[in-house]
Amino acid sequence: MSVTPWALPNWGLDENGAKSRYSLSFMDGLCAQAGLTVLPTQQDSDVHAIDMTVCFPESHAQVQLKCSSVKAMDGEEERIDLDDEWISKWSRSMLPVFIVLVVVPSDIRYWRVDAPRQTVHNAHAYWVQFDKTANRKSVLVPRAQRVTRKTLDEWHGIVLGGFGGTV
């Protein structure tokens, strides 16, 4: 398959801003395909250290997104450092908090590429649930917890379990 990288003019969003928006669109697309709505946190309104909320019929799951081209999930896990403020906020949340690491190529032009009959996302993502009882300054995101359609079923079960329900 021949692919064409995107030619990208500099229209103002720096690479970190692009990573933030891309990770949100990655998860938004997955949720849309599964028939779920999401509530993205408006830029500069991230006062609870939550980037998006996944809306299940019964309740919600909160998600903190990280996007990296450096953490490539080459090993069995990747470490993500946590701010004390995030830990404090997530520990008070009544809803489950999931941390998602979206991995993208180092060259931004290859995050999405065009082929003759498709657009391909060159990204993959992994997740871990934040343990509210721990006070660690980092989390290990396991390679085994790849974000797929089944991840949403797992999260749904965790959300329901918090209210005494089951899937």
Which positions does each model-derived feature cover?
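Mixed-charge (Asp/Glu-Lys/Arg
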Residues: 1-48, 53-167
